[in-house]
């Protein structure tokens, strides 16, 4: 009966949230175990009347936790902040000067104890533009009641590539450990390349030359028909992000011709490793199994080591916002150490909680203080 009751409760929780992924908790008689794989659920829907139609980059706010910054890829350049529900706009940031028109990705990071937002103004589909820059500015606080709209004068880092060529790009990420900005090219029938530049405040108007870091995947894996092997070459990269503590790297691609060729790759950084060493060591990481194709899915960002978000451009409606979670390791460790502890269920305010021994956890493995 005990097993049956908990199983029914877990089933109810899956129905309640609209999440059809496997539950994070599995109960076998007297043994409570965690399913440590990532799972996805829709946490919100982006109201395009309140927010942005063409979302090409997102970043979780570090100054005002609980909000997500979203970057517009429309002709009018601005960013907005909303919650993971996406139903209301909390803040709009306008820019006092225009810097290029094709903005493709955004990221957040810390430099000299100050939070910055970075925007990649580097889209070049035809590879004929040659004008590329990284827009950056201090992240503003979000106060929807008093300052729903503000203006900022951004800075920029102008750059060229070390090979002297033009490149199309849609992915940018910032590493808090090395304080380096990474840019990933978007290509169709070849491997994508990673370039970098250390973040500094004193570049001024001088054009900088990026440093080549590495290829993503192995070029020899592509073969004659590269479009049939997008995984190993991992082309069409549209978004990337590094977790705040630098331990994990997400790289997302998007193939709107063959939906099953769209993935998210998760790279785990070893102790003392650089980003380059991690990407080259894990040449063929497994795609996250919980991910499903998103229409024009071009945005991804970390909240913490155990939570990240994706969303996409609007098609013929309001695009969903997806939240990806896995259990915190403390929950896994406690359960492993005490597999026969009493398990109890509590239904509180529509949220199912699991008590394992003394501590209380949500279904996602978050410890309730």
Question: PLM features: residue spans?
Answer:
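Bacterial Sec-dependent N-terminal signal peptides
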Residues: 1-31, 369
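A short, polar/charged loop/turn motif at coil->beta-strand junctions and beta-hairpin connectors
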Residues: 20, 37-40, 153, 340, ...
């Amino acid at each position: 009966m005990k097993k049956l009751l908990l199983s029914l409760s877990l089933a109810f929780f899956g129905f309640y949230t609209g999440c059809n992924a496997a539950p994070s908790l599995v109960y076998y008689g007297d043994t409570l175990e965690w399913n440590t794989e990532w799972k996805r659920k829709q946490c919100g829907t982006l109201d395009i009347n309140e927010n942005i139609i063409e979302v090409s980059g997102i970043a979780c706010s570090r100054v005002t936790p609980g909000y997500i910054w979203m970057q517009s890829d429309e002709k009018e350049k601005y960013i907005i902040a909303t919650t993971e529900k996406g139903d209301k706009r909390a803040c709009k940031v306008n820019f006092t000067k225009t810097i290029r028109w094709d903005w493709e990705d955004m990221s957040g990071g810390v430099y000299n104890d100050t939070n910055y937002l970075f925007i990649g103004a580097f889209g070049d589909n035809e590879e004929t533009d040659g004008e590329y820059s990284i827009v950056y500015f201090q992240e503003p606080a979000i106060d929807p009641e008093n300052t729903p709209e503000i203006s900022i004068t951004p800075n920029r880092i102008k750059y060229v590539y070390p090979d002297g060529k033009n490149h199309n790009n849609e992915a940018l990420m910032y590493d808090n450990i090395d304080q380096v900005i990474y840019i990933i090219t978007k290509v169709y029938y070849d491997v994508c390349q990673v370039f970098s530049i250390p973040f500094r405040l004193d570049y001024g108007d001088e054009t900088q030359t990026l440093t080549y870091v590495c290829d993503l995947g192995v070029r020899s894996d592509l073969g004659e028909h590269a479009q049939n092997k997008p995984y190993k070459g991992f082309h069409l990269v549209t978004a990337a992000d590094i977790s705040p503590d630098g331990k994990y790297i997400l790289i997302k691609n998007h193939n709107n011709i063959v939906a099953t060729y769209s993935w998210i790759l998760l790279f785990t950084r070893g102790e003392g490793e650089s980003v380059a060493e991690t990407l080259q060591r894990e040449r063929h990481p497994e795609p996250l199994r919980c991910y499903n194709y998103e229409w024009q899915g071009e945005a991804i960002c970390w909240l913490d080591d155990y939570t990240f978000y994706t969303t996409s451009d609007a098609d013929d409606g309001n695009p969903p916002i997806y939240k990806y979670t896995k259990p915190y390791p403390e929950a896994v460790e406690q359960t492993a150490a005490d597999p026969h502890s009493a398990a109890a269920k509590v239904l509180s305010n529509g949220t199912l909680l699991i008590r394992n021994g003394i501590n209380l956890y949500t279904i996602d493995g978050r410890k309730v203080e």
